[in-house]
Amino acid sequence: MPLVEIIHPQDAFDADGKKKLLESLSATCLRWEGIDVNDVTQSIAWVYLDERPRDSISAGGQPLTQNVYKVTVSVMVGFMDYGRIEGMVKEVTDAILAADGTEGTGAARVFVILNEVPSGTWGVDGKVWPSVFTAETVGLEPERVKRMDAAIQSRPRLDVPLA
């Protein structure tokens, strides 16, 4: 159930590039989370293209000489391991460079940050959706859900008493 935000300079993508990113990135991230891509899961996997004026982004304090991208992918904790993260980062980077027309010219301009949201801190329609509940809801196989639950339980949340 990824939420993807791409911060990019104005005019980095033409209309076709934007369309391709909006159509492909939710499916890409769902697949790397191990979630089946279908109409239901696609409806809760959102992509935001956040265009900024070119003069509001710098590299090393200097005006941009090429497009740079900050991609934040937020997922619930428990869905990704290192191999999945690595694959997703590569595929997202490749998709962005293809969309801006510079595929194969180097990816040091694309920073992908995975934000794993702790279980029990993601809300949908006014209700908290813990990772295991979400995994069951989107149809992950029971054995994977069981392993996910064990891993999450081994890293309990730190709740600070308010009183």
Please describe what each predicted stretch is.
Residues 1-163:
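A domain-level signal for the structural core that forms small-molecule/cofactor-binding pockets
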